[in-house]
């Protein structure tokens, strides 16, 4: 029984990995059908549906992976780092680096892969970005408590500016067919970003 469960879990992971790879390829800029996905995995469409009731559920699983990866690591940064500037820099690098290492999933983050799918999926991505923005805002607000001095600019505005930078770099990555990596020149860009944090 345990072997059967492991085999089923492995097949599910194989399906999700194939979907992510298809999103990374030129197929990712078009609607991905279950027929194409089944052919990529080497199974029938019926076999796909034994593991996932719908393609939407496959995207849900990929979004869960994105959420877990980003939120868990952001929480680790917040636990380990106390300096506000370092926290912000590491969170931004995390988002950009995750996108760079997972180009297919970046198409999901930017919404490109979800254009032909259910609106609910885009809503989940919107919620993820709202959670990240809320965490950035909290880091900015905690500066006053941690370092004795806050920002003169509204933390809401600063948090949205930081997240907009990340979203823009991810969008540029997808638009360029993954040519312009999100972390390229980040060390040179950071002082420009940090200068806005007043």
From Swiss-Prot:
Coiled-coil residue windows: 117-144
Subcellular location: Cytoplasm, Nucleoid
Function: Required for nucleoid occlusion (NO) phenomenon, which prevents Z-ring formation and cell division over the nucleoid. Acts as a DNA-associated cell division inhibitor that binds simultaneously chromosomal DNA and FtsZ, and disrupts the assembly of FtsZ polymers. SlmA-DNA-binding sequences (SBS) are dispersed on non-Ter regions of the chromosome, preventing FtsZ polymerization at these regions.
Key words of the record: Cell cycle, Cell division, Coiled coil, Cytoplasm, DNA-binding
Annotated GO CC locations: bacterial nucleoid; cytoplasm
Record-level GO BP terms: cell division; negative regulation of division septum assembly
Name by which UniProt lists this protein: Nucleoid occlusion factor SlmA
The keyword Cell division belongs to this UniProt entry's keyword annotation: yes
DNA-binding region: 33-52
Subunit structure: Homodimer. Interacts with FtsZ.
One Pfam family cited in the UniProt record for this chain: SlmA-like_C
Gene Ontology MF: a single term: transcription cis-regulatory region binding
The encoding gene: slmA
Sequence similarity: Belongs to the nucleoid occlusion factor SlmA family.
Domain HTH tetR-type: 10-70
Species of origin: Salmonella dublin (strain CT_02021853)
């Amino acid at each position: 029984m345990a072997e059967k469960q492991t085999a089923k879990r492995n097949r599910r992971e194989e399906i999700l990995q194939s979907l992510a790879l298809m999103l990374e390829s030129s197929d990712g800029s078009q609607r991905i059908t279950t027929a194409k996905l089944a052919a990529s995995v080497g199974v029938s469409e019926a076999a796909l549906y034994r593991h996932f009731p719908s393609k939407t559920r496959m995207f849900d699983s990929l979004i869960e992976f994105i959420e877990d990866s980003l939120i868990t690591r952001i929480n680790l940064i917040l636990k380990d780092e106390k300096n506000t500037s370092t926290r912000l820099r590491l969170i931004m690098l995390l988002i950009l680096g995750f996108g760079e290492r997972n180009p297919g999933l970046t198409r999901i983050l930017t919404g490109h892969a979800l254009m032909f799918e259910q609106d609910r999926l885009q809503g989940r991505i919107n919620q993820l970005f709202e959670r990240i923005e809320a965490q950035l805002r909290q880091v900015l607000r905690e500066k006053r408590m941690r370092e004795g001095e806050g920002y003169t600019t509204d933390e809401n505005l600063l948090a949205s500016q930081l997240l907009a930078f990340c979203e823009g770099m991810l969008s540029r990555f997808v638009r360029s067919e993954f040519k312009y990596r999100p972390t390229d020149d980040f060390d040179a860009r950071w002082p420009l970003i940090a200068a806005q944090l007043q």
